Amino acid sequence: MDLILLQKVTNLGNLGDKVSVKPGYGRNFLVPQGKAVPATAANVEAFETKRAEYEAKANTILADAQSRATKFEGASVTIGAHASTEGKLYGSVGPRDIAEAFTAAGLPLEKSEVILGEGAFRNVGEYDVVLHLHADVETTVKVIVESDA
């Protein structure tokens, strides 16, 4: 399936690139999310006429992500969880918990922006967490998991 990208997509391409992807990825993710349109002759022509508009929109999205990244620099959040005396959590702390904690602290964050390379945290301690705010913008924050009982 051939598509024209309307914004930069990680590991795929940049704005305006014509890419070939598997039909399911295009039909179920890229097109509904507004990240791409089918590469028909009419869509190619329409894209070229609106290219400056799409580039301006992409630049504002990037600028917003960069300003959010500066707000997250040096930020940390403490999450309390039930834990045993050895420090093992009875549950786990995942992306949703981290996103909710930052949002409660006044820094809005979506769970899809939280990248946990080794999975959810199952022990008490301090962790560095990568936030993927945009295809070009990543930042690291500190998450402290402590026992609340």
Curated annotation (Swiss-Prot):
One of its GO terms (cellular component) is ribosome. GO terms for biological process: translation. This is Large ribosomal subunit protein bL9. GO terms for molecular function: rRNA binding; structural constituent of ribosome. It comes from Xanthomonas campestris pv. campestris (strain B100). Belongs to the bacterial ribosomal protein bL9 family. InterPro entries: Ribosomal_bL9 (IPR000244), Ribosomal_bL9/RNase_H1_N (IPR009027), Ribosomal_bL9_bac/chp (IPR020594), Ribosomal_bL9_C (IPR020069), Ribosomal_bL9_C_sf (IPR036791), Ribosomal_bL9_N (IPR020070), Ribosomal_bL9_N_sf (IPR036935). Binds to the 23S rRNA. Keywords: Ribonucleoprotein, Ribosomal protein, RNA-binding, rRNA-binding. The gene is rplI.
